[in-house]
């Protein structure tokens, strides 16, 4: 649950963007790794991915509790992948944030020696 101070809507949007990125990678991971591991390990991976769906649902509940004025366009913040077609302007913004996050995460950083 969120803390006593409402989380900023931007925090929820960023979290949703990262969840989409995670789901995109997770689907690819399941497809690729699933070819080289046992059925038992594939099931473990699938359970982990389904656990993320529960986390997304809880985060969405928190977002609407913290921001009850939001329109139904915000129901897509935590759902979909980076490959999804945008379903609303809010969805489009989250997709842009997800792609920006992917760029940030995969860009090498200079680490001082």
Which residue ranges define each predicted feature?
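Context-gated lysine
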Residues: 4, 23, 35, 43-44, ...
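Generic detector of intrinsically disordered, low-complexity, polar/charged segments
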Residues: 12-13, 23, 48, 77, ...
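N-terminal acidic leader/helix
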Residues: 2-32
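Amphipathic alpha-helical binding modules
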Residues: 63-113
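Alpha-helix initiation/capping motif
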Residues: 8, 39, 88-91
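Short, charge-rich amphipathic interface segments used for partner binding and complex assembly
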Residues: 35, 39-84
């Amino acid at each position: 649950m969120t803390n006593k101070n409402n989380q900023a809507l931007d925090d929820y949007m960023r979290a949703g963007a990262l969840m989409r990125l995670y789901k995109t990678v997770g689907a690819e991971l399941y497809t690729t790794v699933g070819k080289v591991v046992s059925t038992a390990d594939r099931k473990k991976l699938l359970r982990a991915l389904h656990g993320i769906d529960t986390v997304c649902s809880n985060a969405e509940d928190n977002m609407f509790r913290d921001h009850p004025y939001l329109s139904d366009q915000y129901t897509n913040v935590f759902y979909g992948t980076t490959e999804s077609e945008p379903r609303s302007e809010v969805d489009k913004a989250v997709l842009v944030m997800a792609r920006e996050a992917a760029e940030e995460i995969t860009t090498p950083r200079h680490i001082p020696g």
